[in-house]
Structure formats: C-alpha cells, structure tokens
Amino acid sequence: MMYLWPQAGDIKHLPSGFGVMSRPSDNTIPQGVQEGRVFAIDNEAFTRGFDPERFFRFLEKLAPYRNQVLFVVVPDAVADAAATLDLFEQWAPQIQARGFPVAFVLQDGQEDLELPMRQDFTDWLGDNGDEIDPEDDAAFYAAKGQWEGDCVAFDALFIGGSTEYKLGPETAEFIRWAKRLGLWVHVGRVNSLKRFRQFQLLGADSCDGTFPCYAPTTAARRLSKAVGQPTLFFGGEPC
C-alpha cells in the first residue's frame, strides 16, 4: 500500500512507494510532484475548511501534472454521508471538467444511501435493451454489477468518516465493492502500523496521516519499512 506524504515534507530520500498529498493552502507545486511522484489533492474540509477560490486556483496551477494525479478529493462533510452526497453533486462535475479524476469520500451512514452514479439502474437497463426476469436473482445481480461498473461517477473511494465507522464492517464492504469495480481506494488518518496493515489486507491502494508532520524522521523510517516489507508488521507500534 502506498503512503502519500504531506506536501510540505521533503521526500527525495523516500522510496518509490511514497507519493504526495497536496493541499491548496500550501499554494505551491510540491517538490515531489516536480520530481515525478504521483499525488492526490486534498480539499481541506477536515482541517481548514473548503475554500472554492483557493481550491480551483490550486487545480489550475497543478494542471500540467494531471497525468500524475491519483485523485482529487471532492468536498465532503465529516461523518455526514447525506451532506457529502450533496457536495459531490455540486462540485465533482466542476473538477472533472478540468480533467482531474475525482474521489468520493465515504462518510458515516452511506450504507443507507445511494452512491453517486451517472445514470440510474432502470434507465441504464432501458438504454441497454435488457429485460431481467424478476425471479432470476443471478441475472439481476450480474446486471447490477455491470451497471455499477459502467455508471459509477467517481474514480476513487476515499475512506473518511469517524474512527468507529472507518473500522467497522460497512467500510470493509465498501472497500471490497470498490476493488471489484477497479476503483482506487485511499484511506485517510492512518497513523499506526496496525491500521496500515489492516487496510492493506482489505485491499486499499494508498493512505495518508498526520504523523509525518510531527516526527518526520521517525515516520520516514517506520513507514519505509511498512511500504517496502508490509507483511512483517502486525502490531500497533505508532507510526
């Protein structure tokens, strides 16, 4: 599993399993990005609050590096799935129109709501000329899986939410669903080797956290081991 290092840090010394998590408030092109590292762009809703003008100005600045972008985090509301869906509908099209892949942030309660799709299931069936026997469960689930793959409205699933929700069974199922569709899965706030290992085993592709901001030397050492030799770590040593 890849680790996305905070933008402000120097990552020249880190191995290839590290990318960059960039922030609009830094207002500079990260050194790691200039060196060719892959990166993601945060919306800062969790830390500073989303600032549309600053956010889109930053996207414009990073447009020449679009081919290195893993995802742009669409604005979200912490621990509120319904509000996050509204924000996604408002802001995702504007980000996609600029040629960037987008990440939908999973928040508490999403299991009771519909995920963002470009077309609803009934319309998709009509457009594809498919008629499903209501008694044929296998045909129904096969068609639904194809519809999800064709119509999912985002490129990456960002695991947010409260800590309790993030570690719960609903989130694990969403990760499995996303991987079946071939989506990138990123986990926020990963600050221990135990949690790194947990989400790696679930199939997540990348993660980030705050520990490098407070103890960069220790974080670089421990995370380099976790990224390079992840199967060796099962415990909860802080990282």
Question: PLM features: residue spans?
Answer:
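Catalytic cores of alpha/beta
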Residues: 53-57, 112-124, 184-185, 191-206
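Short beta-strand/loop segments at the ligand-binding rim of alpha/beta enzyme cores
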Residues: 1-3, 36-39, 97-103, 174-188
